[in-house]
Amino acid sequence: MLDAKVAAKIDENPFKQDFPLLAGHPELAFLDSAATAQRPACVLDAERRFYETMNANPLRGLYSLSVAATAEIGRVREQVARLIGAVDEDGRPLAQDVVFTRNTSESLNLVAKSFSPTVLKAGDEVCVTIMEHHSDLIPWQQACRAAGATLVFLYPNEDGVITDKEIAAKIGPKTRICAAAEVSNVLGIRLPVEKIAAAVHAQGGYMVIDGAQSVPHMAVDVRALGADFLAFSAHKALGPMGIGVLWGRHDLLDAMPPMLTGGEMIDSVTEQDATWAPVPEKFEAGTQDAAGIYATGEALAYLTQTVGYEAVAAREAALVAYAWERMGQLDFVELIGHPDASQHHGVISFNVRGVHPHDVASILDMSGVCIRAGHHCAQPLLTWLGVENLACCRASLAFYNDQNDVDRLVDALTQVWTVFHGRD
């Protein structure tokens, strides 16, 4: 692991050489890692290695290649369980409680469609925050509609903080499920998911955590968080696209029906009926992206062992602080969210006064600066914030960025202002 003090030296960059796209395209300042991360060479090599040395369908063959592929999927499942603290009292990974999906969205849909009908009835309440990504909102809208339940929202204060008072006011005897992102993909703020979980558990309810923006940046422990379910995607954590994770408490997963049916998720099938395989196989119908799962293991090893969460946190905090200070010196830039840069975990949302975010992003692209512009799949939040055009710009930084990337962003923003307003 890299020493955190070394990692925090943002005028140096020991990481870009590990990322082929960044190393091969020095003209790019990639500041959109909240949408998807770049992949280190070891991840690309791992996917190729799978196809070259063990390409076979896991779980479906008794020959050596298939057995090897099956073993590797199991190994990565254990690796994920350890990563998120899903271990028993003796520290052994509870791998059977790790379900591989396509992405965070599918993981959250699986909980909403398969778990909520087992506990939700007319008159109950599901609690979410106004900061949720659409993937952690729309499934609960549909679940409430199907059950006759009510969707209740937790709102932050003016700094984006959900207070104890708000939690106490919104979570009550009718609350059966609460779903919240650990880190907002727009504001970058970390939500008090532990407090929310404690409140919902006190009412006999269940806590669903969207870890898409937290797992890539910080250590996550499902027990410490009080999670009953946790969802995240590999592609935001240096892994391949198309691989998601759902962890759930075993008793809850065991009681849930599958969302998809088909090959290898069954125990037995007759002409008129079928029974299901145990967890996790019953939620993994059909052939999975075995090479992607294998490469995900390599990605998580690079993130947690080669770099280390302590170094990730130190470097990203230094980068955000530097970017927040430099962008704050531009009087035409409107920063969004908490005034303390330390509350923005890798994410800075902003607008350029009088310029549509899409125009900002297009002009930045001409300078090789890659950011996101739009509603960020969080329209209710932007509506609540009163953001003009229901859109904003977002620069999201990762440990493989450096001071030069931020300087290029600031220079390009100055160019945006010049294009639209001249040099006054």
Over which residues does each language-model region extend?
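Pyridoxal 5′-phosphate
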Residues: 1-424
